[in-house]
A protein has these predicted regions:
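Positively charged n-region of N-terminal signal peptides that target proteins for export
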Residues: 1-8
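Hydrophobic membrane-insertion alpha-helices, especially the h-region
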Residues: 8-22
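Membrane-interface motif at the C-terminal end of an N-terminal transmembrane signal
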Residues: 18-34
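Auxiliary, metal-adjacent structural segments of Zn-dependent hydrolase domains
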Residues: 44-106, 112-116
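Surface-exposed patches in mature extracellular/periplasmic domains of secreted proteins
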Residues: 84-87, 139-143, 176-183
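Post-HEXXH active-site segment of zinc metalloproteases
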Residues: 117, 121, 133-163
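Short active-site segment of divalent metal-dependent hydrolases/proteases
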Residues: 124-132
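Long, well-structured alpha-helical subdomains associated
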Residues: 157, 161, 166-185
Length: 185
């Protein structure tokens, strides 16, 4: 019996560290990430807007006001979304949003010539993915439940992309939801 205890003794300390660490993580409501953007607790979630309510069409669009791209970028900055110039991760794309588990991610914008309205829609599209990420409690990029078509889902490969493409011109509504979103502490 003593031989068995001695043979397992070196494993006791690492096992206890894992056990205590697992217990601490299970009792905390958020995962520490070192920044202001953390997994959203249930209490915080109650302060967030209802992201599932679809755009009504009453607010400005990128076609009507292409300068909305600047307001999108300001709101993203306020919330902690990084926006960088560079090569998007997906081939043949002008922009991508890289969601990070537990915190808001990074939008990468390809630097190329485009009309102001197209740039606005491109940025709005990526911020719809940010809204999907917020709706997924920063754990996943979940569908908002906004109306899409089966053809759109098939064409763009996912319901999330179909939502983003269908509503990317509705920058005023995207800004409205971002402004209602509190900065996570």
């Amino acid at each position: 019996r003593q031989i068995m205890i001695r043979s397992f003794w070196p494993l006791l300390i690492p096992f206890s560290v894992v056990l205590i660490g697992s217990w601490r993580l299970s009792t905390e409501s958020t995962i520490p990430t070192g920044g202001p953007q953390q997994v959203i607790s249930r209490r915080e979630k109650q302060r967030f807007p209802d992201y599932t309510f679809p755009p009504s069409g009453n607010l400005a669009t990128c076609q009507q006001d292409p300068s909305l791209d600047d307001a999108l970028l300001r709101e993203g900055s306020r919330l902690g979304v990084r926006v960088i110039a560079g090569q998007p991760e997906l081939a043949k794309k002008d922009a991508t949003y890289r969601a990070e588990h537990g915190r808001l991610g990074t939008i990468t914008l390809k630097q190329r010539s485009m009309s102001p309205a197209v740039r606005c829609m491109l940025i709005s599209h990526e911020f719809i993915h940010v809204l999907q990420h917020l709706h997924g409690d920063l754990k996943g990029v979940d569908s908002l439940g906004w109306q899409t078509t089966p053809e759109g889902v098939q064409r763009f490969g996912s319901i999330q992309e179909a939502e983003a493409y269908r509503y990317q011109n509705r920058a005023g509504y995207v800004i409205h939801l971002l402004r209602q979103t509190p900065v996570s502490q």
